[in-house]
């Protein structure tokens, strides 16, 4: 039980260091997950994502509101703020161990 509590506390601390004013209701933890193109239709407002681990590739690809003009964003060891309820997005192919944390509101 202590390790789960420590993990939760660590994730909250990580997000609060990045943006102390960002309020979130949910945290998604992914291991080696390559998300297909989608929109977060139930999310409210912006989200933060960070990629962690020993991997190559795995950028966050964000499209315009019409689902066109993809742009890759490097999220490895850095936070990226985006609105996944408006902009379709997906994970680029990657090799290695890739973890991601997504902080969002529902």
What label would you give each PLM region?
Residues 19-93, 97-104:
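Catalytic core of non-heme Fe(II) oxygenases with the double-stranded beta-helix
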Residues 1-19:
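Non-heme Fe(II)/2-oxoglutarate
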